[in-house]
Amino acid sequence: MSVNRLVKHDATPASIHKLIVAAERNLVDARATNISVENRFDAAYKAIMQCAMAALWAKGYRTLTSEPGHHQLVIQILPKTMDVENDVVIVLDALRKQRNLNDYSGDTVSDATLTECIVQSGQLIKRVRKAGLGS
């Protein structure tokens, strides 16, 4: 773990649970068809980040959000926090890059990318629930 970009964090099970419940709400929002694809993508991506943060908190750390690259770090550390396979990390990192293009360049999000983001967020939520995080 990149110690200079992580700090110790004593998260309570209740705070981890709250973050996972928020991820579940965001996944519900991502599936709502009455909002734009981009907003649905943002909600699904946010669910991914909330799950990744919950996993990191459960290991006793959090990122320095004042430092650039904290989203990338939380995704890249998933193999250590949740035993996520490297091929999944590659997909999640591609979704992170798409989120940046959408947020900072106004790029649109394809239906296929939205679907992938929803699938990945759902799978991460299942992983954190199966791991018993926040219980």
Question: What is each of the regions a protein language model found here?
Answer:
Residues 1-135:
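Terminal alpha-helical segments
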